[in-house]
């Protein structure tokens, strides 16, 4: 992994009681040795693999202005990180989920792109066995479960300030409150809506195949092609590119899929991240509620599974063997 650390700083927030978060600030930067570089490579990998929301700085963002000053050389990175940790403490203190932790600021480069990553990591205790087979306690950073993380693509921000996606943050296990916290701390607003982009793609695809008057098998084949391309992009960590996707699909009436989306005004970006849960709808029908969960391949609709919209009834012909076995045992009273 080609990851080069420019500067990295660690500070700490300690929750002393329900009202106060104590601030402990380092007086120097960390040396980016092998251990630190390995830690950042792991954090970069974990962060890149997780679902993220996108944003952009507001005009009045204090963090953005401080970052500009740091980039111009008006303030050094350590001073920037210390001041930002103070603002972070003030914002975190507003939320009941705030537990403190190790605050990390890292300016690094990965594949010719510069990033600033900000994270609050839990410092956990565990057990270890040494060479003499004695057991002792040890501490470690819980990187795999980090959910208070934000990253700024400095290259994108500085070369394309009109972008709506240079700032990303994790949605977090405690839901919307973490997103609100990041918006407040970063002085940012929501940017590119990846789910909306993916939903727009699916709607455009349905309209495209409908206009071409394809039969069910042909429509399903096109949807499978789109899913295959998008899933490959997702697995490779790449974005969906409309021009590339359009080349994968047949043209109907001398009109490509990309031309169709542009003419119909779907407002799709030229490239955008794939959303796994939304794209799954290309090949699956799924839903849950009221104690019922249903998930089946799209090709089965109209063949083994039938929906009557008038009565909102699904009829399934041929149940899975393990489900049938359970039904038989339960209904027979065994």
From Swiss-Prot:
Annotated Gene Ontology cellular components are: bacterial nucleoid; cytoplasm
Alphabetic keyword roster: Cytoplasm
Q: Name one Pfam family in it.
A: NA37
Q: Which residues form a coiled coil?
A: none
Write out the annotated subcellular location.
Answer: Cytoplasm, Nucleoid
From what superkingdom does this record's organism come? Bacteria
Annotated GO molecular function terms are: double-stranded DNA binding; single-stranded RNA binding
Q: Does the keyword Phosphoprotein apply?
A: no
Q: What is its main location?
A: cytoplasm
Keyword Cytoplasm part of the UniProt annotation: yes
NCBIfam families referenced in this protein's UniProt entry, alphabetically: PRK00378.1
For this chain, the family text in UniProt reads: Belongs to the YejK family.
Listed name of the protein: Nucleoid-associated protein ESA_01050
């Amino acid at each position: 992994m080609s990851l080069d650390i420019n500067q990295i700083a660690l500070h700490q927030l300690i929750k002393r009681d329900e009202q106060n978060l104590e601030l402990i600030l380092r007086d120097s930067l960390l040396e980016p040795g092998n251990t630190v570089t390995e830690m950042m490579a792991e954090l970069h990998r974990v962060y890149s693999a997780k679902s993220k929301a996108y944003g952009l700085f507001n005009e009045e963002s204090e963090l953005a202005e401080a970052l500009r000053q740091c980039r111009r050389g008006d303030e050094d990175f350590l001073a920037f990180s210390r001041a930002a940790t103070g603002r972070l403490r003030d914002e975190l203190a507003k939320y009941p989920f705030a537990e403190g932790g190790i605050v990390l600021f890292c300016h690094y480069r990965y594949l010719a792109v510069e990033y600033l990553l900000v994270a609050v990591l839990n410092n956990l205790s565990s057990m270890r066995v040494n060479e003499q087979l004695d057991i002792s306690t040890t501490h470690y950073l819980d990187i795999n479960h980090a959910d208070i993380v934000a990253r700024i693509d400095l290259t994108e921000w500085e070369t394309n300030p009109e972008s709506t996606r240079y700032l990303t943050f994790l949605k977090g296990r405690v839901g919307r409150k973490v997103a609100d916290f990041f918006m407040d701390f970063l002085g940012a607003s929501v940017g590119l809506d990846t789910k909306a982009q993916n939903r727009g793609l699916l709607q455009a695809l349905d309209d495209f195949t409908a206009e071409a008057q394809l039969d069910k098998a042909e429509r399903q084949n096109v949807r499978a092609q789109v899913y295959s391309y998008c899933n490959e992009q997702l697995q490779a960590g790449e974005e969906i590119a409309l021009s590339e996707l359009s080349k994968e699909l047949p043209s109907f009436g001398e009109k490509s899929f990309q031309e169709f989306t542009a003419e119909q005004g779907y407002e799709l970006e030229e490239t955008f991240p794939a959303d796994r849960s939304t794209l799954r709808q290309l090949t699956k029908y799924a839903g849950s509620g009221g104690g019922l969960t249903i998930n089946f391949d799209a090709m089965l609709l109209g063949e083994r599974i039938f929906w009557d919209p008038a009565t909102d009834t699904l009829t399934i012909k041929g149940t899975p063997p393990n489900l049938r076995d359970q039904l038989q045992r339960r209904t027979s009273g065994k």
